[in-house]
């Protein structure tokens, strides 16, 4: 039984995109659809039995008609090729309050064949070409609905998280114990596990999500635990295998170094629990490249703009999303020509930022030499400009700076 596992598409994210003149949509929409197409094409060509979408099909709970059309077209391709599709509700798919539909409810409403949705914690029995598969669905828990059902307030977030964690753990255990051991079983969850890490190497223990212990989902009744929600691909356990496939595209520069793709697991339905895995692999997709270019300018540099352009030439910027981070002394700040720098990046897909960070001058340039190059008030103005401080706040800081400079000058003349 061939299972394809993906999550966190999420259609509608358009950061760092540009208008596509042909489709009249963001170029980033096409990025996400292209990698989703890779999942679909792999599944069809390899005759997958089922594709698990473990949450966050969309960026928002209210996807546009275009986003719904494009996602539905891919689901239809899978379903029409006799591939079962399981859609789990993630935090971006579900409303915060009870009542409104999730972004995925249209599929069961229309009765689309071979498509199954999981928006409650329960066990599903899905018939595939290779036989039945039990799926315990653990969608994202909406805290508002959870509080309403238990009659508790939100004045204690820690207590609320603990309540969710306890009840989820108990419910997963109960569903696992009720499984038929003669039929393969997987858990499909959109949640945070305590041992997982984000793309920035941050432990999930530092976040505000409710967290489940790995031991609460890595149960022997499951042949595979398919997760979503965290964008970094990672394997948390080997038996049963507990996996986040990660998002299909990089969302921001925090994911710059992440490898993007989806997971494929082949299980043998004739074996007993714990022995069914035949093979597992991670299939990399052609995700849009993110690239950070760093350059440090010295106070002796005669041509800082050329120094930065030379550094850019050391990188392959073609069709990448770029950010340029420049450390520069105040004396060289005005010598950096951002227009020329952006011109050197014309082969890139998008230039997110060219950011100049002020650094201290070298000791041998301090004193009279630096005072001749830039006055204290000018340095303050440059600093505020670089930090994007404008309006009334800028005026207040400049006035305060003038006062301090004046007081300092007067004290030196006494």
Say what each PLM segment does.
Residues 50, 63, 81-243, 250:
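His/Asp/Glu-rich metal-coordinating catalytic cores
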Residues 1-74, 392, 400-402, 406-414:
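N-terminal active-site segment of His-dependent metallophosphoesterases
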Residues 215, 219-301:
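A conserved active-site cap/scaffold subdomain adjacent to cofactor or substrate pockets
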Residues 1, 49, 83, 131, ...:
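Short coil/turn segments at beta-strand junctions that form active-site/ligand-binding loops
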Residues 8, 36, 51, 56, ...:
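Divalent metal-coordination and catalytic microenvironments
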Residues 38, 69-77, 102-105, 170, ...:
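Alpha-helical scaffolding segments of alpha/beta enzyme cores, especially the outer helices
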Residues 66-72, 204-211, 338-342:
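Charged helix-capping and loop-helix junction motifs
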Residues 267-414:
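Accessory, non-catalytic peripheral segments of nucleic-acid enzymes
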